[in-house]
Amino acid sequence: MRISSRFTIAVHMLTAMEYFKGQYKITSEFLASSVCTNPVVIRRLLGKLKEANLIKVSRGTGGAVLTRDATLITLYDIYQAVEEDDADGALFIFHEHPEPLCPVGSCIHEVLDPKLDSIKLALINEMKATTLAELVNKAQTINLAKSNSN
């Protein structure tokens, strides 16, 4: 389990799609301007999100929409859609050759692996518990507070 910028960009994209639903046509150019990246990056991720059945994309400049309610899309769904599955599923990358004759190096995996596994499980559970709707609501709340303070 490795988490790249593909994940945070995809979360940004889907949050924007829901946030601006009905106000703007959600195109790759529109999303690229929000993310501040090249539309090609956005189109690649749109393809992965479509493959995972999280979005529907209309041909041409028809735009993209979510295929289900934002309350039913979790961060873990998005992660699974855009991140490559690595062979070992490790979140943390260990240095390859700890010194086997060192009292610490010889047992560092036994010391640290259970804790790292717990951390990974907690991360996955938090991702599964966090919905896209929560993120959209938070963005709306923040923007409302900003507009009220001006």
Question: Can you say where each PLM-predicted feature lies in the sequence?
Answer:
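Short alpha-helical segments that sit at the start of domains
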Residues: 1-14
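Short amphipathic alpha-helical interface segments
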Residues: 13-22
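A short alpha-helical element within helix-turn-helix/winged-helix DNA-binding domains
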Residues: 26-36
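Short coil turns linking two alpha-helices in DNA-binding domains
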Residues: 38-41
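Basic amphipathic alpha-helical segments that dock to polyanions
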Residues: 46-50
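Beta-hairpin "wing" of winged helix-turn-helix
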Residues: 52-61, 65-67
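Conserved segment of winged-helix/HTH DNA-binding domains
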Residues: 70-96
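C-terminal regulatory/oligomerization modules of transcriptional regulators
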Residues: 91-150
